[in-house]
């Protein structure tokens, strides 16, 4: 956030978006492609594990598919709505841009910390329980944000929102194959 704020101040929001997009395109996309590179999958007959995988047509007929889709869609909607309105919301609380950034900068580290804690200690936690934590953690963080009238509780919002937002990627990436196969 501080870097984005500095880019916006220096180049305006359009210029900042162009710069960020260029960094993603030139720097992040090639790294991502390199990291995902692996041995080509050999064309083999369907194995015993693959027979249990649901086809797209089968998945679309399952209630669990639509419930997961709805949960992840609403989560994404709430997250996007937060990012669209977070700075005006801080301003409405009477807080400066610097104070807002001091809080928001903790979301990223909390995302990473949540993933590390899960990788280290959460392997015994079912993906369903993880998903439940995520789907309760995000609205709880938003309630904390809405009800906070002081600066310090907003750090709790940032940490809880960050952890939930970091863990949603694990829940989303794990629940779909668990329910429908790969």
Question: Model-predicted segments: where are they?
Answer:
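Helix-breaking motifs and short loop linkers at transmembrane-helix boundaries and internal kinks
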Residues: 126, 147-149
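MFS-fold secondary transporters
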Residues: 31, 141-145, 161
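Helix-loop-helix hairpin linking two adjacent transmembrane segments in secondary transporters
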Residues: 1-40
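Extracytoplasmic gate region of multi-pass secondary transporters
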Residues: 1-4, 57-120
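Paired small-residue
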Residues: 152-160
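Structural signature of the two symmetry-related core transmembrane helices
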Residues: 129-144
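Flexible cytoplasmic inter-helical loops of multi-pass small-molecule transporters
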Residues: 35-54
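Intracellular juxtamembrane helix-capping segments at the cytosolic ends
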Residues: 1, 167-180
């Amino acid at each position: 956030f501080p870097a984005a704020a500095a880019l916006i101040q220096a180049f305006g929001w359009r210029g900042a978006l162009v710069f960020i997009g260029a960094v993603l395109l030139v720097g992040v996309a090639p790294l991502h492609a390199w990291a995902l590179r692996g041995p080509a999958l050999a064309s083999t007959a369907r194995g015993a594990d693959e027979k249990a995988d649901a086809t797209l047509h089968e998945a679309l007929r399952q209630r669990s598919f639509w419930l997961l889709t709805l949960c992840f869609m609403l989560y994404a909607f709430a997250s996007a709505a937060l990012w669209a309105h977070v700075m005006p919301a801080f301003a409405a609380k009477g807080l400066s841009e610097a104070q807002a950034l001091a809080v928001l900068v903790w979301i990223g580290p909390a995302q990473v910390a949540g993933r590390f804690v899960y990788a280290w200690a959460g392997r015994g936690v079912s993906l369903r329980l993880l998903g439940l934590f995520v789907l309760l953690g995000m609205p709880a963080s938003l309630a904390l944000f809405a009800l906070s009238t002081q600066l310090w509780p907003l750090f709790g919002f940032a940490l809880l929102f960050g952890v939930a937002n970091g863990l949603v990627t694990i829940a989303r990436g794990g629940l779909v194959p668990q329910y429908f196969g790969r």
